[in-house]
């Protein structure tokens, strides 16, 4: 009766198929890495537990796939209910498992493990509470599964020994194995009185072992690796069936080089190796604690999510209020219901709109209590306060400069690496910061939201407006320590300081000439390349510098703003007026130098000389060689 209960699942005995979960290929793709690893661990643990009870008569397709490191999904075309009912799926020789025609094999319901199902009742399948002692250290464990896992902590011991069947051969993951496969098409039959190579160790020991259907030897199945070793009676390996998974080779390939433990799939080996390397790749974003396994991180994050019943279906983030979840969903949908009335920009949250409006109003409500500096955002004030407290945990390894936050260090690091990850889709120009790209894109849109209240001139950047306003106020906050000269911009002061130091950091790669400003180097390079990027829209003439183009444009304009105060003549360029005024200066100087003759007066004559279209006047003294009545 007890043997029948073990053989017949209908009478309450659990089979591996009863606790197996199947996924299609589409469903398997939807699982993340942590969920896949958890599924593999659970399936292998279930198989090991049922195998330890002697209820496994063949290796499941799912377990075979996991042992080979393959994805354990099943085709959508397979009807798992009918396949499991007739015992077809996963059976050795079945179409689904090996792709060959099924042979006449004993079914799962009428095959019993020799030496297991005959002398054991369901009550005897599990050990009583902590009544399974370890024969190495004497520790008592509650069942055979925990005992098998515990015995792996004795890597140099050899606990699995079959003294009657294989003398001196010990079942250990640290020993080399003799892999033998039984030909499932020709089951081995023994005559009466002869030793069977597939006979189990149940005849020789009372340990709860299971039969290896490939090598014919008993093994202990644990929740991570299975161990098996066999030496057949005839000393010769049997022919392996084509397509049968060589479980022993999988164990040999997935062996830990540190402890010698062998695993039936590579993912389990990778997880095991983290014990030796102490690697903890999974970090909690809330508290920064690291974990070895993704499942442990998922379990830990539930501590932070207590009191947050609202979960985002897109990213799995939890929120304590439904309104916060609604606002968060706009990140995935791209919805931006809040619009700025000044520039028309949209925002997903009202708080972001309030912060943006301070750009137009210039409001800075957050004041630093140490230096009195104001900020438009609270986060900027918090970062600024670290300057006074001296908290600069992030230091650049290249130049030693310290930063208050890691993001600032990352931005600074691009100065050394030259990285420019942000590209403008309009002109293809690259930038090192996203803020620089946003400001640059205004050049293409032509937007100038920042207007000067004095002259009405508009600018695309607020910083440019602040610099321009110093023209009206006359403010020059930057002073040179050497000569005391004042400047309205810090860049002008830096360029001026190089006059005192003689520093010329910008070198031309073509001729080796040095310059004290980058703009001067750029203008100089155009001499080598012949580039003339500035073109006159009137006549098409090109220039190397923008200032030369501005001067040229005055030729086409009718206005002549520069007028001579002596003769009233007007000019379109100031240098031309200065050259013209030198004519009047020479005229006055000649009148003072030449002594007037009593009979003749100095006469001023002019002659045209085509020097760039200008008229040069030459002072001549027209005087005869002798006066009338004089003797030469």
From Swiss-Prot:
Gene that this sequence comes from: ZNF792
Principal location listed in the UniProt entry: nucleus
PROSITE patterns: KRAB, ZINC_FINGER_C2H2_1, ZINC_FINGER_C2H2_2
Zinc finger boundaries on the chain: C2H2-type: 132-154, 254-276, 282-304, 310-332, 338-360, 366-388, 394-416, 422-444, 450-472, 478-500, 506-528, 534-556, 562-584
UniProt keywords, alphabetically: DNA-binding, Metal-binding, Nucleus, Phosphoprotein, Repeat, Transcription, Transcription regulation, Zinc, Zinc-finger
Single GO term (MF): DNA-binding transcription factor activity, RNA polymerase II-specific
Single biological process term from Gene Ontology: regulation of transcription by RNA polymerase II
Phosphoserine PTM sites in chain numbering: 196
Full protein name: Zinc finger protein 792
Pfam families: KRAB (PF01352), zf-C2H2 (PF00096)
Location within or outside the cell: Nucleus
UniProt similarity note: Belongs to the krueppel C2H2-type zinc-finger protein family.
KRAB domain span: 14-85
Biological role: May be involved in transcriptional regulation.
Species this protein is from: Homo sapiens
GO cellular component: nucleus
Coiled-coil intervals, chain numbering: none
Classification via InterPro entries: C2H2-ZF_domain-containing (IPR050636), KRAB (IPR001909), KRAB_dom_sf (IPR036051), Znf_C2H2_sf (IPR036236), Znf_C2H2_type (IPR013087)
């Amino acid at each position: 009766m007890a043997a029948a209960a073990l053989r017949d699942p209908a009478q309450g005995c659990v089979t591996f198929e009863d606790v197996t979960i199947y996924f299609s290929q589409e469903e398997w793709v939807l699982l993340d890495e942590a969920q896949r690893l958890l599924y593999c661990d659970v399936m292998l643990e279930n198989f090991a537990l049922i195998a330890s009870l002697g209820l496994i008569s063949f290796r499941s397709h799912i377990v075979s796939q996991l042992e080979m490191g393959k994805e354990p999904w099943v085709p959508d075309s397979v009807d798992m209910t009918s396949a499991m009912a007739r015992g077809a799926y996963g059976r050795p020789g079945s179409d689904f498992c090996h792709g060959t025609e099924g042979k006449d094999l004993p079914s799962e319901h009428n095959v019993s493990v020799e030496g297991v199902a005959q002398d054991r009742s369901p009550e005897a399948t599990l050990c009583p509470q902590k009544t399974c002692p370890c024969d190495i250290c004497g520790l008592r464990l509650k069942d055979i599964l925990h005992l098998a896992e515990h015995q792996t902590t004795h890597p140099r011991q050899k606990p699995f020994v079959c003294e009657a069947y294989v003398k001196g051969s010990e079942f250990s993951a640290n020993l080399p194995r003799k892999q033998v496969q039984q030909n499932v098409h020709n089951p081995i039959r023994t005559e009466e009185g002869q030793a069977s190579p597939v006979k189990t160790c149940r005849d020789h020991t009372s340990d709860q072992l299971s039969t290896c259907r490939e090598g014919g030897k008993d093994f202990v199945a644990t929740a991570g690796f299975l161990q098996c070793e066999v030496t057949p009676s005839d000393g010769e390996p049997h022919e392996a069936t084509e397509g049968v998974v060589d479980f022993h080779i999988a164990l040999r390939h997935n062996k830990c080089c540190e402890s010698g433990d062998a695993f039936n799939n590579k993912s389990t080996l990778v997880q095991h190796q983290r014990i030796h390397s102490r690697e903890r790749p999974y970090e909690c974003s809330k508290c920064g604690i690291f974990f070895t396994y993704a499942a442990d991180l998922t379990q830990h994050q539930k501590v932070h999510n207590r009191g947050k019943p609202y979960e985002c279906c897109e990213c799995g983030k939890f929120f304590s209020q439904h309104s916060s979840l609604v606002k968060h969903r706009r990140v995935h949908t791209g919805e931006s219901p809040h619009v700025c009335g000044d520039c028309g920009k949209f925002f997903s949250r009202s708080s972001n709109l309030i912060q943006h409006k301070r750009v137009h109003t210039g409001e800075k409500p957050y004041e630093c209590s140490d230096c009195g500096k104001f900020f438009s955002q609270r986060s900027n004030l918090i970062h600024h306060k670290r300057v006074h407290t001296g908290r600069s945990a992030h230091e650049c390894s290249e130049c030693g400069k310290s930063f208050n936050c890691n993001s600032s260090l990352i931005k600074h690091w691009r100065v050394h690496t030259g990285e420019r990850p942000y590209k403008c889709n309009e002109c293809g120009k690259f930038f090192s910061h996203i803020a620089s790209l946003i400001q640059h894109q205004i050049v293409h849109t032509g937007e100038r939201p920042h207007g000067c209240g004095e002259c009405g001139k508009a600018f695309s950047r607020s910083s440019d407006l602040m610099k321009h306003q110093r023209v009206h106020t006359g403010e020059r906050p930057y002073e040179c320590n050497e000569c005391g000269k004042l400047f309205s911009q810090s860049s002008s002061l830096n360029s001026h300081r190089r006059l005192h130091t003689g520093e010329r950091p910008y070198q031309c790669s073509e001729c080796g000439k040095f310059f004290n400003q980058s703009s001067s180097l750029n203008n100089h390079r155009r001499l080598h390349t012949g580039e003339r990027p500035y073109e006159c829209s009137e006549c098409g003439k090109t220039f190397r510098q923008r200032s030369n183009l501005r001067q040229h444009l005055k030729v086409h304009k009718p206005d002549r703003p520069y007028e001579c105060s002596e003769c009233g003549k007007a000019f379109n360029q100031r240098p031309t007026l200065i050259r013209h005024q030198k004519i009047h200066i020479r005229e006055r100087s000649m009148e003072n130098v030449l002594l007037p003759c009593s009979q003749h007066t100095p006469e001023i004559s002019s002659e045209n000389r085509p020097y760039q279209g200008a008229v040069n006047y030459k002072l001549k003294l027209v005087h005869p060689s002798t006066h009338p009545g004089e003797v030469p």
